[in-house]
Amino acid sequence: MHTTQKDTTYTKIFVGGLPYHTTDASLRKYFEVFGDIEEAVVITDRQTGKSRGYGFVTMADRAAAERACKDPNPIIDGRKANVNLAYLGAKPRIMQPGFAFGVQQLHPALIQRPFGIPAHYVYPQAFVQPGVVIPHVQPTAAAASTTPYIDYTGAAYAQYSAAAAAAAAAAAYDQYPYAASPAAAGYVTTGGYSYAVQQPITAAAPGTAAAAAAAAAAAAAFGQYQPQQLQTDRMQ
């Protein structure tokens, strides 16, 4: 006669994490409180006969197996074990909260910004050495404070020189009170030289002999003065 094998899918329980001194009898004794037991066996090594630390318990019905698996980590023979239906496989142990290790989360403000000079501090250029990290400066502020010194070279110096020369010429011109004449308008008067003061010419009616004579006298008087040659060493 062929015996029909009973389906133990929902009644056979895997018990892991057993101490080495647990036997079939002690395993059965623990699960008897949940219902009738058909089989309780501890798996041992064939050569040494010692327990391998796990076993199987077959309950009589599915309800008893569910009651036995309600606590997934029971204490069997003084050691915490793990219990689950055999077809589901071994169930990992639940770690105690006191033994759980985690990685502490860091605040985003502590990891986003690299170490260096804070952005809200501004250091003068005279104290910053090459290679030191300099915080970002707005383009408008950088254009206004690129250097602590005033630029006296290039166009700025040429403008300053022209203004100084004009002021010096005006001061020298005030020291020599003579009437301006059309012939001397193109020449620059410099200090250190004296000129004869021209007497004012009496105005005469145009087209008369007196007017022609006055014009000839003025031409003769100004013809005696040659244009002054500027020396190169005074222009430096």
From Swiss-Prot:
Q: Tell me one GO molecular function of this protein.
A: mRNA 3'-UTR AU-rich region binding
Instruction: Return the InterPro entries for the record.
Output: Nucleotide-bd_a/b_plait_sf, RBD_domain_sf, RNA-binding_reg, RRM_dom
Identify the stretch(es) annotated as Necessary for interaction with EIF4E. Answer: 175-199
Phenotype of the disrupted gene, per the record: Mice die in utero between embryonic days 12.5 and 14.5. Show multiple cardiac malformations, including defective endocardial cushion morphogenesis, ventricular septum defects, reduced trabeculation and compaction and dilated atria. Display loss of sarcomeres in cardiomyocytes. Show aberrant pre-mRNA alternative splicing of key genes necessary for sarcomere formation and cardiogenesis.
Which residues belong to any copy of the RRM domain? 11-88
Q: Which domain of life is it from?
A: Eukaryota
Q: Which GO terms describe its biological process?
A: 3'-UTR-mediated mRNA destabilization; cell differentiation; DNA damage response; endocardial cushion development; mRNA destabilization; mRNA processing; mRNA stabilization; negative regulation of cytoplasmic translation
**Principal localization?**
nucleus
Cellular component, GO, one term: cytosol
Which SUPFAM superfamilies does the record associate with it?
RNA-binding domain, RBD
Q: In which tissues is it expressed?
A: Expressed strongly in heart and skeletal muscles. Weakly expressed in intestine, aorta, liver, lung, kidney, uterus and bladder.
Q: Where in the cell is it found?
A: Nucleus; Cytoplasm
Q: Which Gene3D superfamilies match?
A: 3.30.70.330
Q: How does it assemble?
A: Interacts with EIF4E; this interaction prevents EIF4E from binding to p53/TP53 mRNA and inhibits the assembly of translation initiation complex.
Identification of the protein by name: RNA-binding protein 24
Native organism: Mus musculus (Mouse)
What's the name of its gene?
Answer: Rbm24
